[in-house]
Structures are given as C-alpha cells and as structure tokens.
Amino acid sequence: MLKKNGFIVWPVYFDSTKPRKWRRVPRKLAVEKPTLSEIVEAVKREGFSFTVEENAKHPAYWYEVQGRVIVQANVKKSVLLKKIAENLQKIRAEQSSKRRR
C-alpha cells in the first residue's frame, strides 16, 4: 500500500508464524515475530528515509498493536521488502551470536 509518498511496511509481512496470506516474503526469508524496532533497524541499514507509527494496527490483526513503518523508496515494494527481510535475518543472526558469548 502506498501512502504519504511511501510504502507501508507492517511487521506481519516478515513473520514466519503467519500464513502466506499476510506475509509478503517467502518463509525462508521471514523471521519469527519481528519487532518494530528490528524493522526500523533493517530500513536504516538500507539507507531509506522512513516514518514510524507505533500505535498502528494491521486491519487483519486489529486486536494487536504492531505499529508500522512508512518507507520512502524509489524501488518496487517487492524489492524493498526483500531487502528488509534479508537485513532482519542478519540482525537476528547478530543478536543470537551476542547471546552465545
């Protein structure tokens, strides 16, 4: 969805526990229950400008406050989501390596 000159990115797009109907990336690129802060970090790593709306609720999950990120990018949304998903996997790998130490 395009809004305010940007793409709306919901955490559910990257959640491996959600059905494909709501996920926008393949399960192999998805992570389990991504947080809004992880998505913001992934967007920062790509260098896109963004706006965070912390109290937003996804229409399908109206009972959960997930938040959303509005990303201004000059690429297709599918490319944007794939880049964010790859960065989310890197972020999770870094977090798990820090925990092992």
Swiss-Prot record:
Protein name listed in UniProt: Signal recognition particle 19 kDa protein
GO BP term, pick one: SRP-dependent cotranslational protein targeting to membrane, signal sequence recognition
Family annotation (SUPFAM superfamilies): SRP19
Pfam families found in the cross-reference section: SRP19
Protein localization: Cytoplasm
UniProt cross-references to InterPro entries, sorted A to Z: Signal_recog_particle_SRP19 (IPR002778), SRP19-like_sf (IPR036521), SRP19_arc-type (IPR022938)
Family: Belongs to the SRP19 family.
GO cellular component term of the entry, any: signal recognition particle
A molecular-function term among this protein's GO annotations: 7S RNA binding
Matches recorded under PANTHER family: SIGNAL RECOGNITION PARTICLE 19 KD PROTEIN (PTHR17453), SIGNAL RECOGNITION PARTICLE 19 KDA PROTEIN (PTHR17453:SF0)
Subunit structure: Part of the signal recognition particle protein translocation system, which is composed of SRP and FtsY. Archaeal SRP consists of a 7S RNA molecule of 300 nucleotides and two protein subunits: SRP54 and SRP19.
Chief subcellular location: cytoplasm
Species whose genome carries this gene: Thermofilum pendens (strain DSM 2475 / Hrk 5)
